[in-house]
């Protein structure tokens, strides 16, 4: 079940948004890292 009291707290929304943003940035960095390595692999 969803705890609606947690969703009413704006700080929790900020935490969720930050987590999603960090996860997206990390995924992008990983993709770029392996993409460059694949192209310039020796």
Curated annotation (Swiss-Prot):
Top-level taxonomic group: Viruses
UniProt keywords, alphabetically: Capsid inner membrane protein, Membrane, Transmembrane, Transmembrane helix, Viral genome packaging, Viral release from host cell, Virion
The keyword Iron belongs to this UniProt entry's keyword annotation: no
Record's keyword annotation contains Ubl conjugation: no
GO CC, one annotated term: viral inner membrane
Transmembrane residue ranges: 11-31
Subcellular location: Virion membrane
Membrane topology: Single-pass membrane protein
Assembly and oligomerization: Heterodimer of P20 and P22; further multimerizes as hexamers of heterodimers. Part of the dodecameric portal complex that is composed of the packaging efficiency factor P6, the DNA packaging ATPase P9, and the internal heterododecamer P20/P22 which spans the virion inner membrane.
Purpose of the protein: Together with P22, forms the internal part of the portal complex embeded in the virion internal membrane and which plays critical roles in genome packaging and genome ejection. Both proteins multimerize as a single ring-shaped heterdodecamer arranged around a central channel and interact with the P6/P9 external part of the portal.
Annotated protein name in UniProt: Packaging protein P20
Upper classification of the organism: Viruses, Varidnaviria, Bamfordvirae, Preplasmiviricota, Tectiliviricetes
């Amino acid at each position: 079940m969803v705890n609606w009291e947690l969703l009413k707290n704006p700080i929790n929304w900020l935490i969720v948004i930050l987590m999603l943003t960090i996860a997206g940035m990390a995924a992008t960095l990983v993709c770029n890292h392996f993409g460059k390595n694949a192209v310039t692999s020796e």
